[in-house]
């Protein structure tokens, strides 16, 4: 799993926190950030440079003119797919944690209200005797 990341020398992809991608001249610059350890001010990161792929395409759709366009490298596209899987999984785990905490707070509220209702009913019973 994560063969493309491992081919970049990233031995533990689960340590990846986030990534950034920018274009610089004829290159795409990928920067991968790892989770910070306690006591570290900055997250460890690694940077990779991918040359953009050049293609010649029909410019006007009629077939008379051509123009050169640059696209992201196919290898980089595969790496980004793996990074998106990792980063999306982290977001999903955070969303699930938030949902569980919200459900727990709601349950606390429901239980507190039910306890108050039962105590009120008990109070009514003891006053009537």
Swiss-Prot record:
Cited InterPro entries: UPF0325
Superkingdom of origin: Bacteria
Protein family membership: Belongs to the UPF0325 family.
NCBIfam families: PRK13677.1
Name of the protein in question: UPF0325 protein ESA_03178
């Amino acid at each position: 799993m994560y063969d493309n990341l491992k081919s970049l020398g990233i031995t533990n992809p689960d340590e990846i926190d986030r990534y950034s991608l920018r274009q610089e001249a004829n290159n795409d610059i990928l920067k991968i950030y790892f989770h910070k350890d306690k006591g570290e001010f900055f997250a460890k990161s690694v940077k990779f440079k991918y040359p953009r792929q050049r293609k010649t395409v029909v410019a006007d759709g009629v077939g008379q003119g051509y123009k050169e366009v640059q696209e992201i490298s196919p290898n980089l596209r595969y790496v980004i797919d793996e990074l998106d899987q990792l980063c999306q999984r982290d977001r999903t785990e955070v969303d699930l944690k938030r949902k569980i905490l919200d459900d727990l707070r709601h349950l606390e509220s429901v239980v507190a209200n039910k306890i108050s209702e039962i105590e009120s009913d008990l109070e009514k019973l003891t006053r009537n005797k």
